[in-house]
């Protein structure tokens, strides 16, 4: 039985004061961590405030990015070693905004996955196709290839413990959600790809999220699908009541 994992991705929104206020508003009403994992991914500058506010609560903390080197002359980058020392649990990698705007390659993302595991954190690895790719009938092949490249060299144990987020680019921040069936279809492809690369035991363990205009009104239906174990949520994760509705999808 895979534990549900609902993660907010605040992107470049919120400041430390808003972060503290947000966590104070939700912390008493989070589901128990052993039933559903509630995670917030925040900008690096907000992580100290987030970690402080989340102490002793059922909330886990994600960074939205990190570099693949631990230290050195890499101006402006964030070290995975430092994130681990700070107490960060998850790091989101391969988000389409990072692939598109910051030109991150499959190879960069794969190196980040290795660095995150080396530093005792868990990657939330994102994949997903553009509208053009979908309309060309190549969504399955595209996503399967991203997963294959992203997981290169990772051990079966590492992959079993990680999270893969399927986020069709055309559904991000557009209000256009993939239907629950469309989301399930590609999440199943992700799981089959993991089974081919490793084996069915690993595929049965890896948790797969759907992301793209998830909101309280559609989360239950999406979470009801066989291969969907969680959500990676942008817009609807930035308001406390909405975040609580999301993490309590099965109440
Ligand atoms: O990482 C989150 C996704 O990009 C989804 O964003 P959204 O929920 O605002 O569509």
UniProtKB/Swiss-Prot annotation:
Pathway: Carbohydrate biosynthesis; gluconeogenesis; Carbohydrate degradation; glycolysis; D-glyceraldehyde 3-phosphate from glycerone phosphate: step 1/1. Its EC number is 5.3.1.1. It is found in: Cytoplasm. Keywords: Cytoplasm, Gluconeogenesis, Glycolysis, Isomerase. Transmembrane segments: none annotated. GO terms for molecular function: triose-phosphate isomerase activity. PROSITE patterns: TIM_1 (PS00171), TIM_2 (PS51440). CDD domains: TIM. It comes from the Bacteria. The keyword Isomerase applies. The active site is at 95 (electrophile), 167 (proton acceptor). NCBIfam families: tim. Involved in the gluconeogenesis. Catalyzes stereospecifically the conversion of dihydroxyacetone phosphate (DHAP) to D-glyceraldehyde-3-phosphate (G3P). Belongs to the triosephosphate isomerase family. This is Triosephosphate isomerase. It comes from Latilactobacillus sakei subsp. sakei (strain 23K). The gene is tpiA.
